[in-house]
């Protein structure tokens, strides 16, 4: 990888803990997702949480819309190790119930949680049990008076919603919280976060809400979150996709990886292919991405179909392949090796080399 990297001066925020995961301060930016199963389907929800954990999720959020779901949460919490956030809307009593069951964080929506006395009840409970809170402002559920005041969701409206609830928590002498101001429009979300970042010191949870399907949602999230992260704004993030939640974690880490903020797994450098390719680049990359999903150790692997750009990319990669006639050149740590790969068996050979280097470089295969 090129040594050129602009300096990102990260916004200084206070640090809180969601379970054992630090958020804010100098902590790594945490990547989280949310289950899309029925919470009352305990088996399916636990399975999905474990799938998210396998691809590197730091935190998982669960919707808890009813008291039945709260009872299910109790069982779910007992079966997983990853920190769980309970997503609470409308009924503050559900927050009090999951607090009894060991929830690691409570997400409340100012637009629908109700009067200040209800917020006070949640805060008193959170204080007593040392549970952090996320104030989750959303453009789609802004308080009625703010909608009337501003005419539509605006950055100023989202900021005002957030600050009025930050003020309540401050008044109650509660500082273990993070804040989000999400919108489905990139410009609205980005400007809202910029204003919020200047106004408070608490950690910020980033997200472009309801971003869309797997492709469009990933692009929209990369643009919006990328803008903020490059400015040093953000302490944890969730990519919202109408897709398998596992994809949210992958995209989240890809965004951080692209900005070289947090490394996770294989960074594939691959050409878009043309008639010069000497092997099936697209098929090779797709196969290796699937086979190597379990690898979380950071590594740059270049897969280039010909000798035009292949050698140059391989020089700045941990491992590299440059297409050749029947056999392709192999690079290790930027140096050309005598060994060459048979194009017909390139996928298997390259996978073996990558796994061998991971075992040598990082036996625990850990996330950075």
UniProtKB/Swiss-Prot annotation:
Names of the cofactor(s): [4Fe-4S] cluster
A biological process from GO: isopentenyl diphosphate biosynthetic process, methylerythritol 4-phosphate pathway
Enzyme Commission numbers on file: 1.17.7.3
Signal peptide: none
Keyword field contains Iron: yes
Comment on bound cofactor: Binds 1 [4Fe-4S] cluster.
Keyword terms of this UniProt record: 4Fe-4S, Iron, Iron-sulfur, Isoprene biosynthesis, Metal-binding, Oxidoreductase
Record protein name field: 4-hydroxy-3-methylbut-2-en-1-yl diphosphate synthase (flavodoxin)
Catalysed reactions listed for this entry: (2E)-4-hydroxy-3-methylbut-2-enyl diphosphate + oxidized [flavodoxin] + H2O + 2 H(+) = 2-C-methyl-D-erythritol 2,4-cyclic diphosphate + reduced [flavodoxin]
Biological pathway: Isoprenoid biosynthesis; isopentenyl diphosphate biosynthesis via DXP pathway; isopentenyl diphosphate from 1-deoxy-D-xylulose 5-phosphate: step 5/6
Highest taxon listed in the record's lineage: Bacteria
InterPro entries: Dihydropteroate_synth-like_sf, IspG_bac, IspG_bac-typ, NO2/SO3_Rdtase_4Fe4S_sf
Stored HAMAP family: IspG
UniProt GO molecular function: 4 iron, 4 sulfur cluster binding; 4-hydroxy-3-methylbut-2-en-1-yl diphosphate synthase activity (ferredoxin); 4-hydroxy-3-methylbut-2-enyl-diphosphate synthase activity (flavodoxin); iron ion binding
Source organism: Histophilus somni (strain 2336) (Haemophilus somnus)
Binding site for [4Fe-4S] cluster: 271, 274, 306, 313
């Amino acid at each position: 990888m090129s040594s050129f990297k602009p300096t990102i001066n990260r916004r200084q925020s206070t640090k809180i803990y969601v379970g054992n995961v630090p958020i804010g301060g100098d902590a790594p930016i945490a990547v989280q997702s949310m289950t899309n199963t029925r919470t009352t389907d305990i088996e399916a929800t636990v399975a999905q949480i474990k799938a998210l954990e396998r691809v590197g999720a730091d935190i998982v959020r669960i919707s808890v819309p009813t008291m039945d779901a709260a009872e299910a949460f109790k069982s779910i919490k007992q079966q997983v190790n990853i920190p769980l956030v309970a997503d609470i809307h409308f009924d503050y009593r559900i927050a009090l119930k999951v607090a009894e069951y060991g929830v690691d964080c409570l997400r409340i929506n100012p637009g629908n949680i109700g009067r200040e006395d209800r917020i006070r009840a949640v805060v008193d409970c959170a204080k007593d049990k040392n549970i952090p809170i996320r104030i989750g402002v959303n453009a789609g559920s802004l308080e009625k008076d703010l909608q009337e005041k501003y005419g539509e969701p605006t950055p100023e409206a989202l900021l005002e919603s957030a600050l009025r609830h930050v003020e309540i928590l401050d008044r109650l002498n509660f500082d273990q919280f993070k804040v989000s101001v999400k919108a489905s429009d990139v410009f609205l979300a980005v400007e809202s976060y910029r204003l919020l970042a200047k106004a408070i010191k608490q950690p910020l949870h980033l997200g472009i809400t309801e971003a869309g399907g797997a492709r469009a949602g990933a692009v929209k999230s990369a643009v919006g979150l990328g803008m903020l992260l490059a400015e040093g704004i953000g302490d944890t993030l969730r990519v919202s996709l109408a897709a398998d939640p596992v994809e949210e974690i992958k995209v989240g880490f890809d965004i951080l990886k692209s900005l070289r903020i947090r490394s996770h797994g294989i960074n594939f450098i691959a050409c878009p292919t043309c008639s010069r390719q000497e092997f099936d680049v697209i098929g090779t990359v797709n196969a290796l991405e699937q086979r190597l999903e379990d690898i979380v150790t950071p590594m740059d692997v270049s897969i280039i179909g010909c000798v035009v750009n292949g050698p140059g990319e391989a020089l700045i990669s941990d491992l590299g392949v440059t297409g050749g006639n029947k056999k392709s050149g192999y690079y290790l740590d930027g140096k050309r090796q005598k060994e060459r790969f048979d194009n017909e068996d390139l996928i298997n050979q390259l996978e073996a080399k990558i796994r061998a280097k991971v075992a040598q470089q990082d036996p625990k295969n850990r996330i950075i």
